[in-house]
From Swiss-Prot:
Source species of the chain: Streptococcus equi subsp. zooepidemicus (strain H70)
Transport in keyword set: yes
InterPro entries, sorted: ATP_synth_F1_dsu/esu, ATP_synth_F1_dsu/esu_N, ATP_synth_F1_esu_C, ATPsynth_dsu/esu_N
Keywords: ATP synthesis, Cell membrane, CF(1), Hydrogen ion transport, Ion transport, Membrane, Transport
Record localization: Cell membrane
Subunit structure: F-type ATPases have 2 components, CF(1) - the catalytic core - and CF(0) - the membrane proton channel. CF(1) has five subunits: alpha(3), beta(3), gamma(1), delta(1), epsilon(1). CF(0) has three main subunits: a, b and c.
Membrane topology, record value: Peripheral membrane protein
Name assigned to this protein: ATP synthase epsilon chain
Any Pfam family matching the protein: ATP-synt_DE_N
CDD domains: F1-ATPase_delta (cd12152)
This protein's GO CC annotations: plasma membrane; proton-transporting ATP synthase complex
Family classification: Belongs to the ATPase epsilon chain family.
Amino acid sequence: MTQMTVQVVTPDGIKYDHHAKFISVTTPDGEMGILPNHINVIAPLQVHEMKIRRVSEDDRVDWVAINGGIIEIKDNVVTIVADSAERDRDIDVSRAERAKLRAERDIAEAETTHDINEVQRAKVALRRALNRINVSKK
């Protein structure tokens, strides 16, 4: 069976390293499905839920919360360099819920003071928190 190596690397180290037969990521241009022997690519990534179908007898699917970064595909090695990333099993849901509430509060405060930059920053924080919450439920 043809397979590829998938690695997710953050400033804190390697967060994921397994063999897969399919992965799905989100770029600014939309969702991209990747199979073994994919053409070489480098692309930016959005905040998203990365789906990884591992090479295993039980057809296991892993989910990783990706908080921006880049993807490089070369010679059946997929490397994602992300600002931060967490596997579904490693997400602290209560921490993510607190981050969501904090971001919602920050958005409301920034909108009342018409601070556009703070609104945008808080919306990114909210998107990241929601992404982590969604991945934790997979």
